Structure formats: structure tokens, C-alpha cells
Amino acid sequence: MQYLAILLPLLLSVVLATYIIPRILVVSVKKDLVVPSETRDKGRLRVPRLGGVSLFPILVISVGATMVCLVKFHILPLIAYEDSDTFVYYMFGIAGLTMMYLLGVMDDLLGVSLTSRLVIEVLAAALIPLSGLWLDDLHGILGIFEVPWWFGIPMTIFTIIYISNAITMLDDVDGLAAGTAMIAFAVLGFLALYVQEYLLLMICATMIGMLIPFFYRNVMERRIGWRNIYLGGTGGLVIGYVLSFVVIALSRMGGTSLPEGIIMVCFGTLIIPMFDVLRVAVTRMVNHRNIFQRDNNHIHHRLIQGGMSPMQVLATILVVSVFFILFNAVGVWGGWNLSILLVTDVSFWLILQVVISYYKNKNRDL
């Protein structure tokens, strides 16, 4: 019966998203809430950007309704209230997610200055470590084990902001943000099921369920231009914040309910966006440019510049993402040194960048 914690929120979120998305499309087109896209197919350069406004309400409804049903019929214990610390984690998490959601909506509709955006993101991210949920142990990565609060809390805040914005950067290619997030939530959901963290499991199942219709519309029906829709800044911030919360929660279980190095698997689900944002930021600094100024230097842009179609880019990035996840899982369960595992991840990433640069330059010279 525990699998109802997967099926109920998954099915409910699929139904809700399938119902809501077409109505968001209609409003976006009527109100001209669309943005140009250079990476999506020619002939479909203006795409509705408000898809992400549906995510937070669907998450709350699906998880809330599932909890009520499972607890009411005594299928699962009253998860959120068994442990006062757990209750605080989730309440602070909901508050922070609400702030991120409102920030995304304001940014998509009106635009928000960089300073205001950063202040709100810091406040929202700070709520998670203030609840007591923060990265207090790196389990030997680079020789670091227990982390003092004065370092761990700022590191956690930075990580949440980092992941939230990294996911947002993937929304230029049809299905890329949704596909990457679904893979990550599937892996994290499996880990949550393994340790019987049913509320985390419901969250992961709900996120997968609501992203399935987005992925279907943007990939399976990609030739029908008006049906495609951006997740937008709202979607990226919501997905990134939820991913951050789940990743941090599961990473803290390393050495107890999960293997010591599970932090590498959790963060390994997000290697592509995290490594890519770091590479882009370093490149901008080396070139004496503003690191917050958007450009066409992200991995999906580079693959397209190398001659790939958007669908080939999508398939390539998702396959590479799965490779990194499997590689880290094998390393963790095989008892590998986490520092060596991290260095190997970075080495694979650098080799990938060299290959992409080769084909990009080759295509430019044609």
C-alpha cells in the first residue's frame, strides 16, 4: 500500500497539469505574455512563458490531498507531525517555496531587478537552514567531514540559490528543464522510498507528474507551435528550490539510512546544470564580463552551435545526465573515495567540453 504514496500524487498532478496548461496558454497568447526564443525551432520564435505558475498550486494540492487520504485511511502514519523537527523543516520549506514562487511570477510578468531578485532568493534560501536542515557533513569530499554551522549554513544558502538558477538556464530547449528535473526527481524519489521518507517521496512523485505534460507538449507535440510553453522563471525557481530541499534532506542521511557518500548521488542528479553554470561564470570572469549577463554560451547553446538539432541536444544532455548519475551511484555503493569520484566527474565534464568545442569550431569553419 506504500506505493499509493507514489501513484496518487503522480496521477493527480498529471491530471491537474493537463487541465491547467492549455488555459495558461490561452491567457499567455491573449495577453501577449510570450518571449522570443533563439534556440527553439524557426517559425516558432515566440513562446508563452507562464507555464511555471501552475507548479506551486499543483504541488500543494497533490501532496496535501494525498497525505489526507493516506492518513485518513490509516495507510501511512501522520508523517509530517511525528517529528517536531521534520514539521519545522517542511513548514519553513513551504514558506521559502512561496517566496520563490511569488518572485518568479513577478519576474515573468513585470520583471524584477537583479538586486531585488538576489535579496528575495537569499531570504527564501535562508529559511531552509534556519529550520535546522543544512549541509553539516561533506562525508570526506576533498577531505572535509563535519562542517561548522558558520560555514555550513552560508554554503547551504548558496547551494539553494545556485541550483534554483541553474535549472532556470535550461529552459531554452524544448523539454530540457522538465526532462532533467524528472530524471533527478526519479532518482531522489527512489532514495526516499528506500529510506521510507514518504513525504519526500510524494513531493518527488508530484513533481514528476506535473512535469510530464510539459515534456509531452514541448517534445512529443513540438511541431504544433502554439502548444509549446516555457516553464519560465517561475518554473525554474520552483523546481530548483524543491530539488534543493530534497537533495539536502537526503544528503544528510548519508552514513545512517543511506550509504556514506550518498551526497554524491544526490548532487550527481544535477551535475549538468551545476557544472555548466560554473563553467559559464568562470568564462565570463576570464573575459572580464558581468557574470549575470545572459549569453549563448550554455551547454545547449554550444551543442546547437556544433550542428545539433534541439531534439538531438535534448537527447544528448539527458543521456549524459543519466551516465553521471549511474557512475556516481556505482562509485558510492562500491565504496570509492569521494574525492576521487568528484575529480573523475570533473574530468569527464572537461573532456565533454573539449569534444563540444571541437565540433563547434568545426561547424563554424564550414
Language-model-derived ranges and their functions:
Residues 1-277:
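"…together with the soluble PPM/PP2C metallo-phosphatase catalytic core" -> "…together
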Residues 6, 251-366:
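C-terminal membrane-associated helical module and adjoining short loops/tails
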